[in-house]
UniProtKB/Swiss-Prot annotation:
Its EC number is 6.1.1.9. This is Valine--tRNA ligase. Its main location: cytoplasm. Keywords: Aminoacyl-tRNA synthetase, ATP-binding, Coiled coil, Cytoplasm, Ligase, Nucleotide-binding, Protein biosynthesis. It holds the Pfam family Anticodon_1. It comes from Pseudomonas fluorescens (strain ATCC BAA-477 / NRRL B-23932 / Pf-5).
Amino acid sequence: MDKTYQPHAIETSWYQTWESENYFAPQGAGDSYTIMIPPPNVTGSLHMGHGFNNAIMDALIRFRRMQGRNTLWQPGTDHAGIATQMLVERQIEAQGQNRHDLGREKFLEKVWEWKDQSGGNISRQIRRLGSSVDWSRERFTMDDGLSEAVKEAFVRLHEDGLIYRGKRLVNWDTKLHTAISDLEVENHDEKGFLWNLKYPLADGAKTAEGNDYLIVATTRPETMLGDSAVAVNPEDERYKALIGKFVELPLVGRRIPIIADDYCDPEFGTGCVKITPAHDFNDYEVGKRHNLPLLNIFDKNAAVLPACQVFNLDGSLNDSVDGKIPAEYVGLDRFEARKQIVAAFDAAGLLVSVDDHALKVPKGDRSGTVIEPWLTDQWYVSTKPLAEPAIAAVEDGRIAFVPKQYENMYFSWMRDIQDWCISRQLWWGHRIPAWYDESGKVYVGRDEAEVRAKHNLGPDVALQQDNDVLDTWFSSGLWTFSTLGWPEQTDFLKTFHPTDVLVTGFDIIFFWVARMIMLTMHLVKNEDGTPQVPFKTVYVHGLVRDGQGQKMSKSKGNVLDPLDIIDGIDLETLVQKRTTGLMQPKLQKAIEKQTRAEFADGIASYGTDALRFTFCSLATTGRDIKFDMGRVEGYRNFCNKIWNAARYVLDKGEDCGQNGEAYELSLADRWIISQLQRTEAEVTRQLDQFRFDLAAQALYEFIWNQYCDWYLELSKPVLWDENSPVERQRGTRRTLVRVLEVALRLAHPFMPFITEEIWQRLAPLAGSTGKTIMLQPWPVANETRIDQGAEDDIEWLKGLMLGTRNIRAEMNIGPGKPLALFLKNVSAEDQRRLTENEALLKKLARLESITVLAAGDEAPLSATALVGEMEVLVPMAGLIDKGAELARLDKEIQRLQGEVQRVGGKLSNPSFVDKAPAEVIEKERAKLAEAEQALGKLAEQHARISSL
């Protein structure tokens, strides 16, 4: 083995070996165990969140594979409708064209070309993360097989009355020209205005105050062109007499009714609200309650139409309402129309006032444009009938959320679910399998031939397929079963579905998780006809944040690429990476400054195993993950520790009883074997409970503290002593080898590369056969090998050695200087342990003698430590330079006194205490307490040495 651990020297070659040997394919004889990778968008590259959930999924898959389960971890990517189309459109626009210049077919060819070029980027990253996915089953949501499954799902849901087409109000993205879901809308807090406008009363009606007008308050005066009513609260005494009367809509001259509805808040503005059902979601609900006409005033760009499109609530045309719009507003953008309409109200003396008002402005999460509630024909899934069984599946435990608290989030969403708009006005995606004849009649089928055959439509009937595509979440909602061959009843579908675990972030529980449950349970059935769930457990993790707890985002300039931590990156390349392609170029300087301050030397190469172990160690259930580069460095050191321990073991491991020779186990051997059983049980228990953090902690504690720090040291006196019996030496060698081999198997799910590299060399000595650690059996604790007596004896030994070490450190005595040790208050058990381990103790603690003091014996002036009730004494006379040590202590005491004075003064200063933040004051108090405690210890030490 190389002297130092170099991750890059082993990682790529081992991955290539595993993949070429087909080790990732299902092959266990046990029950199936399936995880479907949440498909990343084909547009992008993996970020830290992907890195995190890949580490978690691979830990689970490798763990279960070693347990003998028939594991399938299936990879794939999502076509990411809007994101991909936007990206390719930008590339085309850079060449002076747009998608309409190319036409649908040519544009889609460009998208497929781009997908083929960039799609490999994600699979390359997944490989670098060490993910043991079955590449032979890689899927893409636009693959032929998946496209057939999408069509089948749509047709079946339509036949079951769960998909319908309707004219409804949607979130319309005026830049992308598509409907988007509520979950793709971001509400931004902005300062806006509230316009108070006069609406004249019709037919000579007057208010209680004698006014011939009502004052309505609105944040969107431009939509008044489409008003259908003015609403007041039924309990509002000011307006009760006017309910059922009319106002004359200014600028337009249309008579609209005054209606009573609880939606109106009498305390807001004047208590009168204009109702525009075609351009406001709340108004739409009011319109439904009062059967108001829907007047659409905008085109797809949110520019004013030549005349309102007037509809009834069922989507049919309404010819009875005058939809005229004054010519001066036709063609104006909505915000320009706002200015001109307000000016017209002002000129007519109808503008009462303009008040400042805090607004929540809805914007598209991808386009950034203000979303317009707009009336369009869209396809919908009727979700309430699908939600009921999906809620029941979680309630009765067929699906469990880990942590359980996320069930409440799921239930609250599902119990208030709205119908799902699944059509998108895009070109990239699964085209809706519906056709229209020239009269507009719609036919749904798997293809045009099926439609014609089913409805007896001859070649003389022209059919046109719907131009819209399905919401990306519709196809990814079928992910667990469509990728296994559904609707065909394939062997893979029968074997690996339902899947076992879904690993996902909490932010897509509704986007994806809930929809997968609903669609799967409706479309996939068990042999007895009951609904099949898509997965048995949903493991929900938080967001991966930066070291300061900030969300990682391009605009904050704090994004980390997992591969840059694995391979390293120099500062200039990192700065360039973080500042290129910013949506807001003005942030460039601040991001560059921040990056140069945080990563002055760039990022070192830490390797995949250190990063993966970091992710697992941070995987506390449900909470956001604060990513800390210091942890990665610490776990890189952990890799080095394992590497160096392996080099020592391989150097000393020959003749370890591998051929059946006799051996004898020492106390230390029995102790480490006993500790190993406890660690095996603990790591298994925590992995079973998805506590990756506690499993990693148990592993780290065993390998670093118990095996490397203690057991390797305890082994040296046995192996280096020529007088040690051969059987004893062989027993220690055997234990060194076999305990390390088991520890490597325990660590393999977290750190696959380093464990494979070492295991290959260690396996012959440990008597292990097989080509790879990946397919070795998972360690199972053997309770008969837990030796409480050995554990107690070693704890006593460790206590004695640590006590002696502490005295050396406190008294500044060099580690190589032999000490005389006195023991006081020694019990019979202490005496037994001392008798059995005296030679070992002397070697490890560098002791020249050990003297047990009888009761009443006078002890020399000594530094002391306690092991249980036994006192450990080291006489000081002649061991230290008294004058030099006192001078050193005086200097340190003086420094600490200054610190106590400085911090104490600050805390007794009222102007500091009154103005400083609470956390700063708390920090200073902790600093003072620490300094005072250290000062007390030094004073005691000073007194002890002075008395020598």
